[in-house]
Structure formats: C-alpha cells, structure tokens
Amino acid sequence: LAAFVGAVEGPVSALYAFGVLIPLAFVALLPAAAASGVPLPASVVAGVYLVALPTALVAAGAWLLAKRPVAFPPPQIGADHPAVPDRRPHAIVVGVLTAVGAGIVTAVGVARWAAPVGAAGVGIGAALLVAVRPRRVVLASVNETESGLPDAMTIVGGAVAEGVAVERAIASAGDRLTGATGDLFARAGRRSDTLRVDVREAFVGEGGPARTVPSPRVHGAVALLAIAAREGRPAGDVVLELADQLERLRELERDARRQLATVTGTLSNTAAVFAPLVGGATVALATGIDAAGVDGLHSLSAGGSGAAPSSGSGLGGFTSDAAASGGDRARPLPVPVLGQIVGTYTLILAVILTSLSTGLEQGFDATLVVYRIGIALPTATVTYLVAFVAAGLLW
C-alpha cells in the first residue's frame, strides 16, 4: 500500500491537469474562436465535454482503483438489511421538490439557462442523500465495530491463553469495552449464557448481534472464536496473533490514508469547489469575451466598409460576420448552451472525482461513495452558479 501511495501521485496529477485544468481553461477560448470566424458547433463541444472527457476520466480512475491493494473488501450493505428501509419514494419526492425549488431560484437569481444545472445538481444530490442515509448509519456502526475489534480479540485471546473459557472471555470483553464493539461482545456473551448456545450461534445465529453486521473482519473473527471454543487454551495464542494482525492492518490503513490525504483531498476539493469555481468564472469570462470580441469585430467592419453591424450579434450569440457567412457549415455556440455544457461537465466531474477520491482512500465502498456524491453535487452546483455571478460582476 505504501508503494501504491507513491506511484499514484503522478497519474493523479496528470488526470487533474488534462481532465480539469486544461478543459476548463479552453472554455475561455471558445468565444475568441467564434469571433475570429472559426465557431465550434455545440455538438462538437458537447461531445468533447460530456462524452470524450468523462469517458477518459472514468477509464483512468478505474485503472487507478484496480491497482489499489485491498486487505478486506468494504462492507456490502444491501437493501435486505433490516436497518435499511426502502427510502426510494422519499428520495424521489425530496429530489423532485428540491430540484424544482433550486431551478426556480437559479432562473430568477442567476440566469434562465442555468436553471437545469441548478435543478439537476441540487435535486440529484438531495435524492442521493435521502436514499443512502440509512445505509450510511449502518456503515458508521460497522466501522466503529471494526475499529474496536483488535482490542476485543486481544482481551479474549489473553484470557483464553490463561485457561479461561471462550464464552466467559467474550462476556468479559463486552464488559470492558465501550461502543459498538463492546455492545456486540456483551450481547453475544449474554446470548451464550442465557440460551446455552455455542459461540458461533451466539454471534451469528438467529437474532445474533453479528448476524446483520456486513463485515468480513467481524465474521472472520467470529469464525476463529468458534474454533477457539472447540480447541480451548492452545487457541489463545492464535487469537492473539489475529488481534495483532488486525491492529497492524488498522495502523497500515491509517498511515496510508494519511499519506494519501494530499491526493484524495485535492480530488475532493476539486470535485466540489475548485472545478465548479473555475468553470463558473470561465463561463462568465467567455460571456465578456463574446460581448467585447463580437462588438469589436463589428466596429472594425463598420469602420472599414461603412456597413452597420449585423443585427444577429449579442451577448449570448458567439456570432461574427465570418460566422454568419459560414452558418451553413457550423452554428456558433451561444453562451447559454456553453454554460449548460460546462455546468453539466462540472457535475460529472463532481461524481467522477468524488468516486475516485473515496475509492483511493477507503476502497470502493458503494455506500460511502454515494453519500459523498450526494454532498458534492449540491456543493459543486452552488459553487458554479456563485462563481458565474461573482465573476460576471467583476468583468
């Protein structure tokens, strides 16, 4: 994992440059190209920003994630989990209502063309948060349980090595530990004592506290404890060895996340803040360049030939006399269309970069990925719109 941390920085920097900085900077050149008589049709710009670039980013991200070493797969929290109710109807209602509200506010406060961007980003983000919240709660409980597992196994292993029965050692661990792990072992100890069942049944039997915990680490520890209950005192050293391995793994993961913090932090900040900020400001700059460039060309045309400027020019047109004469070859790209394309691209970046950042840091945990995307989308949307308005006031 340490080698992966060093190897990933270069590819992530390249992805950052060619997937974010250069494409967003190129947006400002589009009105200049149109004013110079070389307009790019909307279909070409949309194809590049909404198909080609996202496809390349997804491929690069998948390549990076495939190289990440994984000691344990992340928890898989399915819809059949008893603590995960079906929130899809609630998510749809909340998503639609927030999308409508965000669209109206955006149309009134920013621009009519920005309403679809505002509605999509805020609405989808809100729907994802509502839909994934129960799974996020379960995931937090699983993570807390796993974090205390090395301590619990150390207590049990030490007691078993001294000749204490596994069942009593489990109950003792439950009494000495706090939090989710202590509760898990305490409940298993009570079940074993009350129902007179074996260790495996106490943990993962019908109604067992670990039965619905979707953690390979927890279930692996339970399997070892069940073997220790059969083998007796000699198995204590094996349990202690597992506890040491879990502790080393926890330290390794903590250290790797700390080393990856710069890379993953940059990706997360770019997804939610930097890319939308640059995108909104660049679209505002493109608007100003469009107005200044087209008016300048028309003035030169009028001064040189005595002809009046074409009535087809305007702030949202990206038009020029040369473009008009070549209108049959390529329709110029209006600012509203450009703003929608760039806005959609920033939302796509929010999804892709947030997924990549989370995958590099935690492994591709679907619950955590969806949860963070649900936060990143509204944040990116608001940042994009505010940047457009603020930059427009400056320019």
Whereabouts are the PLM-identified features?
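Short, charged cytosolic
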Residues: 1, 232-247
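Glycine- and small-hydrophobic-enriched helix-loop-helix hairpins
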Residues: 1, 149-234, 388-395
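Hydrophobic alpha-helical signal-anchor/transmembrane segments
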Residues: 2-162, 177-182, 210-212, 244-395
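Hydrophobic alpha-helical membrane segments of integral membrane proteins
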Residues: 170, 238, 369-370
